């Protein structure tokens, strides 16, 4: 009986381990992980976070280049704006990579013409990432990365459901080849999409309206 219980427990543990697939996302030299799925990546100058474990599914990643490059006979620190991209994890380790950048002129020219961020997998294959360069208002706009990303997500109808990035506009709005727009998805998805796009004043008005109605 005890043997049966033990075998059953081991089977459950094995099933649970298999069911939760994950992959490691790491960064190459001078690439800084800033935000993962809307949450700031805790890091420091002396102890930067160079990798994260991600469960299978769609994730939102924000990174930037932050490294020392040559400027004539001197060294200088070059830091870019944050870049945001979506990543579909399928139990496959990957590294975020850029070409080797050594001088200030080379680095500036590379990012000015549009950087090609890529994922490099353990088998040597690469995938070019579709990134968005985040832009803030004023010098201090990049001091709070979570807030900057939240503002972007609110504007574009992106939320996180059970830890995964979901573009509500893609889920709730369908555009055919003729450009005809069709509202799809269930009512809850549509409500979430419009709520994320609402202003603070509109959200407050909606909450008051909802409180005044009996939905039981």
UniProtKB/Swiss-Prot annotation:
Keyword terms: Signal
Domain of life of the organism encoding this protein: Bacteria
Q: Which Pfam families match?
A: DUF2057
Give the signal peptide, or none. Answer: 1-22
HAMAP family cross-referenced by the UniProt entry: UPF0319
The record's comment on protein family reads: Belongs to the UPF0319 family.
By what name is this protein known? UPF0319 protein PBPRA1013
What organism is recorded for this protein? Photobacterium profundum (strain SS9)
